[in-house]
């Protein structure tokens, strides 16, 4: 067994290697060009479209989708169970999840509880495990989101969904287990009422909150995790203990997409609503200057950083670190994203080269499940599953 000093040296060497890799080829690369329309080894394929009929009872809304995706959902749920059982081999944790979790968490707001019950029934997966599957998006979402404004005042919103860090590494093909298992679950969703689109979103089958979406002609919205000592674990503990005056962040995002009727209304709700976990809300509108990053603590807004093209701020970039702080030295996606945007210039920013920026390592990395591009005014919403072949950084 390694002595403490030798172990410390090994860990230090590993950290230094990762830090260097963040800023050196082949782990990074010059800004990609001409990657759109998507093709080649970093492109897994387009996300399929499904319609969610909001006129149906919540229990039945996800039936068609979950009939198709139940086998893939069972795979990822079993992987999560196996990881838990690795640390607690007795199986007691999963027994508590299956038997006690629904009662501990109590009633969820709005339609969400009935929707999860419907998903559990269709997939034959215990409700506690479906709830756990919905909860864990509050903790493991590492993403890059960008809103950019061109010289004509036109807005483009892009995001990489990075998910699955530390949730199992496959040594046979150098990939994150959960990241790979999420790709077959990636879907585009058209939420309709009276046969008309209310909003569109990209998500994972089985998850009833939303992390990425837009309301055609009005606004676009993405959600990134924010690391904080006063984090989501405390929010969930408060919820279990009966203090339920805060919203689950994925449920809030979906509620805003479904009900808000303007950029300003969405911004106001996202800024003021109490939430269970700290988060970044990246919001884009339909006219010049309507783009911002809302940095949220659980109880209040800490910062609203807005586009201001007249002052040279024609884009906002958000990863998983407060903009006024340096990113973690092992995980700097902000710097290469900004570098590629600056090289692109406001004169040339477009749907196509937004995809270029999001395809450049390490903005694209082993955790990247999908890339979404949004043009609110043109009603464009495209989601593509991604791969990052070696050499590629783990996050």
From Swiss-Prot:
Q: Which residues form the active site?
A: 143 (nucleophile)
Tell me the domain of life: Eukaryota
Q: Which GO terms describe its biological process?
A: cellular response to tumor necrosis factor; ceramide biosynthetic process; ceramide catabolic process; fatty acid metabolic process; keratinocyte differentiation; regulation of programmed necrotic cell death; regulation of steroid biosynthetic process; sphingosine biosynthetic process
UniProt's post-translational modification comment states: N-glycosylated. Proteolytically cleaved into two chains alpha and beta that remain associated via a disulfide bond. Cleavage gives rise to a conformation change that activates the enzyme. The same catalytic Cys residue mediates the autoproteolytic cleavage and subsequent hydrolysis of lipid substrates. The beta chain may undergo an additional C-terminal processing.
Gene3D superfamilies noted in UniProt: Penicillin V Acylase, Chain A
Pfam families given in the database record: CBAH, NAAA-beta
Catalytic activity of the protein: an N-acylsphing-4-enine + H2O = sphing-4-enine + a fatty acid; N-dodecanoylsphing-4-enine + H2O = dodecanoate + sphing-4-enine; N-tetradecanoylsphing-4-enine + H2O = tetradecanoate + sphing-4-enine; N-hexadecanoylsphing-4-enine + H2O = sphing-4-enine + hexadecanoate
Q: Does the keyword Phosphoprotein apply?
A: no
Which GO molecular function annotation, any one, does this entry have?
N-acylsphingosine amidohydrolase activity
In this chain, the site described as Important for catalytic activity is at 162, 320, 333
The entry's localization annotation reads: Lysosome; Secreted
Q: Family, per the entry? A: Belongs to the acid ceramidase family.
Q: How does it assemble?
A: Heterodimer; disulfide-linked. The heterodimer is composed of the disulfide-linked alpha and beta chains produced by autocatalytic cleavage of the precursor.
What protein is this chain from? Acid ceramidase
The record lists the organism as: Macaca fascicularis (Crab-eating macaque)
